[in-house]
Amino acid sequence: MKTIIVFLSLLVLATKFGDANEGVNQEQMKEVIQNEFREDFLNEMAPMSLLQQLEAIESTLLEKEADRNSRQKRCLGENVPCGDFPCCGKLVCQKTFGYGWLYKSPYCVKPSNG
């Protein structure tokens, strides 16, 4: 019986003093929450801006890499049958006397001056 009375008196004292400090504790908790929120917000903003910077850098690098990996259109050299593919540089796709009569297709040749 004595132990029950001791526990009940401790319970009453804890409840009474706990309620007295509740207003102070709530204000402290609000301050702590606001400070944590501000710190979390700032901590989240820094990685977000870093993430955005990394994405911008990555997109420019991918564009450069895509340009580097893409080939120029293939072209045909001199004395090669042309048709669907263009001739390289200063060569012109013409029917010639030498090869044209055998294969019946135009060839990439140097343009004649005349």
Curated annotation (Swiss-Prot):
Which residues would be cut away as propeptide?
21-74
Q: Name one GO cellular component term.
A: extracellular region
Localisation per UniProt entry: Secreted
Check the record and name the InterPro entries matching this protein.
Toxin_22
Keyword Cell membrane set for record? no
Indicate the principal place this protein occupies in or around the cell. Answer: secreted
Which segments of the protein form a coiled coil according to its record? none
Arranged from A to Z, the UniProt key words for this protein are: Cleavage on pair of basic residues, Disulfide bond, Ion channel impairing toxin, Knottin, Secreted, Signal, Toxin
Read off the Pfam families from this record: Toxin_22
Q: In which tissues is it expressed?
A: Expressed by the venom gland.
Note the superkingdom of the native organism: Eukaryota
Kindly list the GO molecular function terms attached to this UniProt entry.
Answer: sodium channel inhibitor activity; toxin activity
Q: In the record, which residues are listed under signal peptide?
A: 1-20
Q: Which cysteines are joined by disulfide bonds?
A: C75-C88, C82-C93, C87-C108
Homology family:
Belongs to the neurotoxin 14 (magi-1) family. 03 (ICK-30-40) subfamily.
Q: What does this protein do?
A: Ion channel inhibitor.
The free-text domain remark for this protein reads:
The presence of a 'disulfide through disulfide knot' structurally defines this protein as a knottin.
- What protein name is recorded for this chain? U17-barytoxin-Tl1a
Provide the species name: Trittame loki (Brush-footed trapdoor spider)
Record lineage: Eukaryota, Metazoa, Ecdysozoa, Arthropoda, Chelicerata
